[in-house]
A protein has these predicted regions:
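Short alpha-helical DNA-recognition segment
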Residues: 25-44
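Alpha-helical structural signal
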Residues: 17, 42-43, 68
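Intrinsically disordered, low-complexity and often Lys/Arg-enriched segments
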Residues: 1-4, 97-99
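The alpha-helix within a helix-turn-helix
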Residues: 21, 32, 61
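Short, basic-rich loop-to-helix N-cap that marks the start of a DNA-contacting helix
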Residues: 49-62
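A short, Lys/Arg-rich alpha-helix, primarily the initiator
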Residues: 2-26, 73
C-alpha cells in the first residue's frame, strides 16, 4: 500500500477501485454493465479522469449499499483539495462586508 502524504486527497475513483472493486474482483466493464452506464464512464472515474456525479453516486449507492452522500463527500473533499492548491486564490482579496 502506498504511503499517502499529509494533506493529500485521494480521488474517489481510487477508493472505488481499491476498496470496492478489487475485493469483489470487479472490472470497470462489469461494474459499468451492472450500473447501466458506459464502460468509459466507470474507467475514467477509476483512472481519476472523471468526477463522480450525483447520478453516478446514486448508482454506486444502490449497487454497493452505501449512501450516495458517501460518494459525493469523497468527490467534494477532493475538489476542494484541488481548488485549494490553485495559486491564484491567494490574489483574491476580501470584498465589501455586509453592514
Amino acid at each position: 500500500m502506498k504511503k499517502i502524504p499529509f494533506g493529500y486527497s485521494i480521488h474517489p475513483g481510487e477508493i472505488l477501485k481499491t476498496e470496492f472493486m478489487e475485493p469483489l474482483g470487479l472490472s470497470s466493464y462489469r461494474l459499468a454493465k451492472d450500473l447501466h452506464v458506459s464502460a468509459p464512464r466507470v474507467n475514467d472515474i477509476v483512472l481519476g479522469k472523471r468526477s463522480i456525479t450525483a447520478d453516478t453516486a446514486m448508482r454506486l449507492s444502490a449497487y454497493f449499499g452505501c449512501s450516495a452522500q458517501f460518494w459525493l463527500n469523497l468527490q467534494n473533499k477532493h475538489d476542494i483539495w484541488l481548488a485549494a492548491k490553485d495559486k491564484s486564490l491567494s490574489r483574491v482579496k476580501p470584498g465589501a462586508q455586509a453592514a
